[in-house]
């Protein structure tokens, strides 16, 4: 095996793509700052107990583990940054009011999510802590849509769900809650026959519950799905509140292209309210996922309402129109103090200046040199090529 080969699911990022990703990172973090979000940078590796204390088994399976040579304890390479940021809010900052935090960093997955996914992601996201109301959910979704607009994503579509719908059904039927994992899998796959088959094998599952689950698998489409859900789902405690929360968000975003999918229950057990995903026309899967997760911070000794989102910058950049090569000024290499001073002034003004080393006049693949720094009438002057 060649020494240049990388593990499966990992890849180098070459100059043009790396430049595009870095430009996106700067643009988006600057955008989040205009909303009042503060940047934090948690470590790449933590004790596994801390990384997984507030999440389910899915994240455990995605986390690469190793032994700390200093303490002998098990460490984890983060597979998601959300729990780390939650720890910072709950334990380190320890603020009483609303806190807005954003972040960007690499995460590593033990296995790729699917055949088209990478194992190393550059995760960027934002979280609001300390407010349980609809206003925080709306602000996060507005920031998501601004994020994609800033990046240049065309025809973004917002897909809404609410974990309270599923939770209301399970709370009304304890037998159903015992099979939550299998039921959620079938619902995500919209597998109505599979739901019927599972119901036939589970003793004590109520007929109303079976009908509700089968109806739930078909409740996806436009905003009118919420009204249909009120008719078809049982009026159990918590159901009306969840549907009201969805309707409030729909009413607050009249200009957003959106859909409602009440069977998108992938975050059940983690999320505690509104959840969402955003899709773009040039990507095979959701670009952004997020939602409310009020119970997660309890693992760090402090209950705090929370809502947020994250996305993979590499995945986002890969589907965008390739950036034009950067424009640059070509300059000769030399030790003339006047040349050195001219190059320094141009760079300080924000220009890219590439000094051509002797014998390498054609080696400027990453840049388009449309100007050059030339000695004219005893002075170094920029002229158009």
From Swiss-Prot:
It comes from the Bacteria. SUPFAM superfamilies: Class II aaRS and biotin synthetases. GO terms for cellular component: cytoplasm. Keywords: Amino-acid biosynthesis, Cytoplasm, Histidine biosynthesis. It is found in: Cytoplasm. Coiled coil: none annotated. One of its GO terms (biological process) is L-histidine biosynthetic process. One of its GO terms (molecular function) is histidine-tRNA ligase activity. Pfam families: tRNA-synt_His. Pathway: Amino-acid biosynthesis; L-histidine biosynthesis; L-histidine from 5-phospho-alpha-D-ribose 1-diphosphate: step 1/9. Required for the first step of histidine biosynthesis. May allow the feedback regulation of ATP phosphoribosyltransferase activity by histidine. Belongs to the class-II aminoacyl-tRNA synthetase family. HisZ subfamily. This function is generally fulfilled by the C-terminal part of HisG, which is missing in some bacteria such as this one. Heteromultimer composed of HisG and HisZ subunits. This is ATP phosphoribosyltransferase regulatory subunit. It comes from Bordetella pertussis (strain Tohama I / ATCC BAA-589 / NCTC 13251).
């Amino acid at each position: 095996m060649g020494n240049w080969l990388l593990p499966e699911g990992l890849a180098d990022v070459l100059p043009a793509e790396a430049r595009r990703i870095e430009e996106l990172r700067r643009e988006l973090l600057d955008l989040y700052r205009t909303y009042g979000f503060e940047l934090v940078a948690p470590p790449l590796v933590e004790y596994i107990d801390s990384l997984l204390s507030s999440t389910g088994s899915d994240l455990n399976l995605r986390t690469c583990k190793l032994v700390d040579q200093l303490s002998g304890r098990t460490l984890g390479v983060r597979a998601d940054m959300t729990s780390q940021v939650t720890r910072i809010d709950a334990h380190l900052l320890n603020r009483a009011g609303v806190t807005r935090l954003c972040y960007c960093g690499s995460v590593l997955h033990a296995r790729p999510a699917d055949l088209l996914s990478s194992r190393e992601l550059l995760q960027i996201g934002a979280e609001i802590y300390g407010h349980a109301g609809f206003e925080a959910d709306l602000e996060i979704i507005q920031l998501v849509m601004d994020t994609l607009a800033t990046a240049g994503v065309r025809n973004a579509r917002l897909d809404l769900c609410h974990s309270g719908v599923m939770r209301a059904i399970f709370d009304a039927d304890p037998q159903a809650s015992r099979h939550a994992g299998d039921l959620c899998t079938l619902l995500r796959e919209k597998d109505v026959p599979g739901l019927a088959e599972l119901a036939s094998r589970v003793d004590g599952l109520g007929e109303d519950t079976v009908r509700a689950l089968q109806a739930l698998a078909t409740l996806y489409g436009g905003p009118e799905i919420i009204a249909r859900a009120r008719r078809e789902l049982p009026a159990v405690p918590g159901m009306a509140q969840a549907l009201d929360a969805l309707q409030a968000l729909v009413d607050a975003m009249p200009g957003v292209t959106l859909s409602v999918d009440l069977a998108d229950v992938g975050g059940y057990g983690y999320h505690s309210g509104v959840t969402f995903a955003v899709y773009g026309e040039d990507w095979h899967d959701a670009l952004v996922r997020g939602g409310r997760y009020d119970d997660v911070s309890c693992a760090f000794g402090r209950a705090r309402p929370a809502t947020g989102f994250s996305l993979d910058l590499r995945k986002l950049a890969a589907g965008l129109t390739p950036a034009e090569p950067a424009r640059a000024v070509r300059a000769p290499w030399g030790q003339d103090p006047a040349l050195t001073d001219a190059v320094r002034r141009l760079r300080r003004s924000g220009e890219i200046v590439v000094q051509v080393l002797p014998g390498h006049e054609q080696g400027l693949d990453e840049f388009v040199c449309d100007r050059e720094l030339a000695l004219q009438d005893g002075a170094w002057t920029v002229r158009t090529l």
